[in-house]
Amino acid sequence: VVRLRTLSEPQKMQSAVKMMLEILKNSTFERSNIQRVQSNTQIGQKQLQENPSRLMNIRLYRAIYGQHAYAEPITGTNGSINRIQPAHLQQFRDRFLVAQNMNIAITGKLTLKEAEKLANTISTHIAQGVAATTLPQPTPATRFNIQHIPYRSQQAHVSIAQLATTRDDPDYLALEIANKMLGGSSFNSILMKELRVKRGYTYGVSSTFRFTQAAGLFSLGYSTRQDQLLDSIQVAHQSLIQFVQQPINLEQLKETKAGLIRAFPNQYSSNASINAQLGHIGFYRLPVNYLSDYAERVEKITAEDVQRAIRKHLQPDRLTLVIVSEHLDKAALEKMLQDNLLTPISLTPTLRNMKTTPIDKITLAPMQEVVEPDLVPSDVPALILDNAHNESDVD
């Protein structure tokens, strides 16, 4: 993504656009400049390596995506960043920052005619190039995959995920609604009620769909005490199974849809947010009336639409679990997950038979220097061949 924010006064805007185009066309990527950036990132990378959520996300994406481009973190790792050479940046620029890949979103004090003229200036003053090929679809899992990262702490961190679907899937809106019901940020979500309100396992739990060009992820995550780890996973898994199998709660569906409609205007409350929405529409080739018709399309989603979508796209028997904790009995965990699939769901344990001592604030300390992001042999500079992540917008 290339972003430019400038004053709308014609002379200043023209100078800014001219400078941007000059940089795009003629950057030389001097080795000394690259080395300076690499040096500046080392401290940040070190801090990230000591962050359990960072470790969990890297392991999660690599476990699910394998050799796919999405497997590698967009911020890189020490291993991949230090291997970047000027030729890599030049190759990326020449292959992807070209007119055939361009999606231009413009917001600000411009008429439509002025915006069209500006877009034409940008698109005709850079290399035309060739449009990037479509990303391949990743291979979905066929069974449970449990990954454990040893980490000394009283708290354990849990991420449960699976491949989901793409941004252009017709089920997109139904799945967004389903996700709000299952693991939205409010206390009315199913996971929050089961894990926090009823059992006190965690301060917060959330789920999300990541809709991308190739299949993105459905994931849920939370942290809990080490002694509550297996029980909390059991409840989270049972909640997911029950959500897929049982009829949709009509009252919760009504409240969720109303909440989405009320919150939607906040997504374009400033020039920057409007620009982001326009860029999203262009990049994913959404209909031009996407924003104006949003509320109407949400209202039309029925319980049957949501039920069909989650039964199609959620697979509680093919989950990848990444757990950052001091100890984990993987055999016991897998047996518990398999048992959940075979027996009728009754969410247990309940508040009546468990201790709900609040979780103390924990200072996390690694068992040893954490080098997890650099351990995987496939750790290479992020794949750029056939990678279509190259939208360009001007604010």
What are these model-predicted stretches?
Residues 1-24, 42, 53-79, 101-107, ...:
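M16 family metallopeptidases and their MPP-like homologs
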Residues 66-74, 98-99, 103-166, 268, ...:
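An aromatic/glycine/proline-enriched structural segment found at the starts
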Residues 41-48, 138-149, 258-267:
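Short, conserved secondary-structure transition motifs
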Residues 222, 244, 286-292, 297-312, ...:
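C-terminal soluble interaction/assembly domains
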